[in-house]
Amino acid sequence: MKAVILCGGLGTRFSEETKFKPKPMIKIGKFPILFHIMKIYEKHGINEFILALGYKGNVVRNFFNKENLIKLNNSYYKYIGKKKEPLKWNIQFCFSGLKTMTGGRLLRLKKYLKKEENFLLTYGDGLANVDINKLIKFHIKQKKIGTVTAVIPSARFGAIKLNGYNVSKFSEKPQSGEGWINGGFFIFKNEIFDF
C-alpha cells in the first residue's frame, strides 16, 4: 500500500522558517518533519511514498538527493548513526501545484494511485502516535470509502487546580474536552476519485 504525503502548503504561520523551505522540511532534531512522518509509516511496514510537492518542492527533492542519500532503482538509502542501517523507501515526487487545495492535490495524484485498492494519506506537517496497521484493519473492516483519524486535542495551556489560595495540583496541558478534531492520518479506497 502506498502512502501519500501532502508537502505543498505555504506554511504561513511559520513564515520565519518557511520563507526558505516548505513546512514539512522544518527540522525536529536532526531531521525534517517529513522524515519523521515517513518513519512512522516505515515502522508499520509502509515504504512506498508519493510526495505531493508544491511550494518550495525543490527543497524536498534536494533533501532526498543529498550526498548522504544514494538513489538505487527509485529507492533511497539513508545511513543514520553509527549502525548505518539502510532505510529503503520507494519515493515518487509529484508536483501538485503552488496554490492547489487539498482535494485538488489529491485529484492530481489519481494516475499514480490507479492500481491501488486502498491508499494512505497524511499532511506533511503533522506528527501523531498513530497505529497505521490498526487504522488499515479498521478501514477494511468498516468497508467505507474513507477513514479519518480523530483525536481529542490537548488544551493550549497547562491547568492549575486551586484549593482556596493554594495550588493543589498542576496538570500539564490536559485534553481540552472540546470534542474531536482531525488527527491528520487517512486511508481511502480508490473509489474516492469517483466523487
Explain the meaning of each model-derived region.
Residues 162-178:
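Short, flexible, basic/aromatic active-site loop/helix in glycosyltransferases
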Residues 1-62, 93:
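N-terminal glycine-rich phosphate-binding loop and ensuing alpha1 helix
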Residues 183-194:
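Conserved nucleotide-sugar donor-binding
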Residues 9, 55, 133, 190-191:
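Alpha-helix/helix-capping structural signal
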Residues 60-163:
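Conserved beta-loop-beta/alpha segment of the NTase-like Rossmann-fold superfamily
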Residues 13, 63, 130, 170, ...:
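Residues that scaffold the ATP/ADP-binding catalytic core of kinase and kinase-like folds
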Residues 55, 122, 162, 187-188:
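A conserved hydrophobic position in a structured secondary element of the catalytic/binding core
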